[in-house]
């Protein structure tokens, strides 16, 4: 995405890369080279569509998926495919850390519990199960930082993304010596820490040639997809909250201090804004639930429209509440609020009366119910929720927007910029280039609300009743999947 000095999108491009491989249940791997290859195709297209010259680019920003473990050898070669964010094979390593350090001490040290999704547990798994690969590991990076390393030669990471490694002292914004020593990780293998708008490198010869950018163009640290997406949606001060549905689903709130949920059911990370933090809940398989249905059962007759548009149009034929049909979106285990990698998805209440439309709508409602679990925890923690902004695929669909307003029982807003993480990364680059003095100033100047959706009073009651039933499903099925 190319942004001008007024915050307008001058041009953008996307390029697909190979989806993750899942050779066993709970595994998820990608090849880092695929990310770089896609970047090398997308960036020149975006520059061409923006009709700008390489010398017109003042600064480059970054965002990308969090938690993934990219391991390089001494010469910079990828040791093995990256274990990405939704890989949950590492539950034994999570338990090992918890037993060794103690659950309370873990949260005190990192503001988070040890979860299978976090980077450290993935490193521990490789060390235990692939010792020959582990012997080769010299450098450890996260996904977006691998791409930046390819174009700058600098090993760097921002505070927000580093928060999801389980190696950062989140409260003090530095690597945790306690965690490094407990896990046996050499700090010298980790990237240097930067605040998100800070310049951490410049485009090198490889990057200039591959991307069509000017040699020496400054590059900022950027942020993981959630913090960057929040910046792109203006979620930078307490009270404004986002609910974003991508492959995963996230409810995100900015805070002026580290806000801890005692049970570790919410993540507390550094924000992309210096001196600020955020608290968020995560649904593992939000948009992934709808993609799973599409891949397994199809999107209906191909009439030239986007398959997801066809699916949501079909879902609109079913009534709100789906006549009692419920979907729990636990296809990849679940984080918030269960912290259970063994949780499994379920359709509950299926009858001969139900149709494909009911099932699709139940998936849309079930994902919204899962996100509502985070709002319930926010309420318990006294985290202010004055405005809710929607992002991702859940903001593009008129039906899913309305379902979320009805499930949350709250007016929701949709901002103009649809690609929140890319837009946020560009804003961070603008701050790094000096276009704006701060992230707050930039968001106030360029983030604009395009529309609002109000809850339907007659439907809110139906959703409240179904949500109460939804909350009972996990407890009723947990023992079935525990083994």
Segments the model singles out, each with a brief description of its role:
Residues 32, 91, 98-115, 120-157, ...:
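Active-site core segments that coordinate phosphate-bearing ligands/cofactors
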Residues 15-16, 85, 284:
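A generic structural motif
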Residues 1-80, 108, 136, 208-209, ...:
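N-terminal glycine/serine-rich phosphate-binding loop of ATP-dependent small-molecule kinases
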Residues 48-85, 113-119, 148-169, 192-196, ...:
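Short beta-strand-loop/turn "lid" adjacent to the catalytic site in phosphate-handling enzymes
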Residues 15-17, 195, 271, 455:
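Active-site donor-binding loop signature of nucleotide-sugar glycosyltransferases
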